Every structure is written in structure tokens, then in C-alpha cells.
């Protein structure tokens, strides 16, 4: 009996807490709704004080533009009250500022995009730029798809170490099927070249030694030629 009473009390308390949460949410929503209505009505009243706005422009005019136009209109009225503000026309003539000159501020503000629209417009690219970016991305994909061994080494690369008299050529061979780099070294055979006489001064010059490669040794050491 006691257990059933405790369970009932817990259920009642949970329902009360749930109802209190719902009521708090509803109250906060109603408060936010009244706040939004007050702000909208205040902006509608502010728009009525801005001249030279068409009815369709008033309906679609954002709040930030309404604030900017209101500040510009206040500055314009201050200049009119001063009486010393002059405006330069297209014919390079000066005339006093009038109330109707505020139409220029209206047209300029309506023409300007909002900040987020302006950022989106600046991010738009022309067709040539898009093609150039796509071509660069395609080339990058092609280069990244080639194996690393093929990118780094050509099928044959020779590296020479030491003087010519003790020349050792190191060939790097790339297997296109397994992309493994194999190294093979062989010592070139040197042969002495005969001295040739100079027909003008009758002196002999030693043209040095030249490497001679035996084709049979190259075939035995190179797996491609086998």
C-alpha cells in the first residue's frame, strides 16, 4: 500500500514538473512574440517618417536599411537647417541643398545589396575562372593517380660518381608492373686509345681513355634485354 502511494506521488510530481516546463516555454514564446511585434511596429512607424519611399519599397525594405536611411535623413535635415550646404551638379555648378535631394540617398540605398547578398555576389565566379579551376583540379588528380615510383624516377636514370678514369654508372630500372626500383651496378672496361699525331705541329696528344662496354655483359646484367 505504501509502495503504491509513493509511486502515485512520483507520477504526480513528474506530471507537475512537465506542466511547469511547458508553461515556462509557452510564456517565453509569448514574450518573444510580443517583443517581435513591438519591434516590427516601431520599424513601421520609423519608415513612415522617411520620405520618397514607394509602397512596394516599404514592404520589402529590411530593418538595417531602414535604420541607415533614418540616420541619413537626420543628417540631411541637419544640413538643411544649417543653410550653408552646397551641392555640385553635373554641369560643375553649385546650388543650395534641397529636401528633394534626399531622393539620391533613397535610390543608392535601395540599389546596394545586403551584406550577406554582397558576399555571395562577390563569391560568384565567371566562366573562365571556373574552367581554369576545374582544369587545375583535373591535372592534380591525374598527377596523384600516378604511382610514386613512376613520378620520381624515369625508366633509366644514370648517376656518375668519381673521376672519368674510375667511372661507375648506376642505372635505376623501374618495373612498370610492380613499381619496384631495382639497382644494378657494373664496372665499365677502360681501354687505352692510341696517340694521334698533330699534322701541323708534329706533336703527339694523349686523348685519354674511353669506356668500352661489352654487349654480352650488358645483356647478362640487364633483365630487359634477356
Curated annotation (Swiss-Prot):
KO phenotype (gene knockout): Adults are viable and fertile, but with a moderate frequency of somatic gonad defects, which increases on an ehn-3 mutant background. Low frequency of embryonic lethality, with embryos arresting paralyzed at the two-fold stage; increases in frequency significantly on an hlh-1 or unc-120 mutant background. Many embryos that survive to hatch become uncoordinated, dumpy larvae with variable body shape defects, typically in the posterior. One quarter of the embryos from homozygous hnd-1;hlh-1 heterozygous parents exhibit reduced expression of myosin myo-3.
Region Basic motif, residue ranges: 23-36
Location in the cell: Nucleus
Major place of residence: nucleus
GO cellular component terms, semicolon-separated: nucleus
Pfam families: HLH
Annotated Polar residues bias: 1-15
Cystines in this chain: none
GO molecular function annotation: DNA-binding transcription factor activity, RNA polymerase II-specific; protein dimerization activity; RNA polymerase II transcription regulatory region sequence-specific DNA binding
Domain named bHLH: residues: 23-77
Record region (Helix-loop-helix motif): 37-77
One GO BP annotation of this record: gonadal mesoderm development
Top-level lineage group: Eukaryota
Annotated region (Disordered), positions in chain: 1-35
Keywords in alphabetical order: Developmental protein, DNA-binding, Myogenesis, Nucleus, Transcription, Transcription regulation
Keyword Transcription tagged: yes
Cross-referenced InterPro entries: bHLH_dom, E-box_TF_Regulators, HLH_DNA-bd_sf
SMART domains on file: HLH
Function: Probable transcription factor which regulates early embryonic myogenesis, in cooperation with transcription factors unc-120 and hlh-1. Involved in controlling the number and position of somatic gonadal precursor cells (SGPs) in the gonadal primordium, and embryonic body shape.
Protein name (record): Hand transcription factor 1
Taxonomic lineage: Eukaryota, Metazoa, Ecdysozoa, Nematoda, Chromadorea
Gene: hnd-1
Amino acid at each position: 500500500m505504501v509502495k503504491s502511494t509513493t509511486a502515485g506521488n512520483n507520477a504526480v510530481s513528474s506530471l507537475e514538473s512537465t506542466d511547469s516546463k511547458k508553461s515556462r516555454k509557452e510564456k517565453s514564446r509569448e514574450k518573444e512574440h510580443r517583443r517581435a511585434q513591438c519591434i516590427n511596429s516601431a520599424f513601421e512607424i520609423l519608415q513612415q517618417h522617411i520620405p520618397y519611399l514607394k509602397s512596394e519599397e516599404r514592404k520589402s525594405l529590411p530593418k538595417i536599411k531602414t535604420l541607415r536611411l533614418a540616420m541619413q535623413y537626420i543628417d540631411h535635415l541637419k544640413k538643411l537647417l544649417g543653410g550653408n550646404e552646397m551641392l555640385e551638379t553635373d554641369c560643375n555648378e553649385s546650388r543650395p541643398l534641397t529636401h528633394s535631394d534626399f531622393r539620391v540617398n533613397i535610390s543608392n540605398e535601395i540599389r546596394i545589396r545586403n551584406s550577406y547578398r554582397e558576399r555571395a555576389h562577390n563569391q560568384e565566379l565567371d566562366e573562365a575562372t571556373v574552367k581554369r579551376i576545374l582544369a587545375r583540379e583535373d591535372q592534380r588528380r591525374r598527377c596523384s593517380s600516378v604511382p610514386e615510383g613512376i613520378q620520381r624516377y624515369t625508366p633509366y636514370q644514370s648517376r656518375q660518381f668519381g673521376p672519368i678514369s674510375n667511372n661507375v654508372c648506376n642505372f635505376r630500372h623501374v618495373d612498370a608492373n610492380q613499381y619496384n626500383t631495382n639497382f644494378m651496378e657494373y664496372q665499365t672496361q677502360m681501354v687505352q686509345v692510341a696517340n694521334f699525331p698533330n699534322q701541323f705541329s708534329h706533336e703527339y696528344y694523349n686523348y685519354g681513355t674511353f669506356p668500352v662496354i661489352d654487349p654480352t655483359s650488358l645483356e647478362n646484367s640487364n633483365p630487359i634485354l634477356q
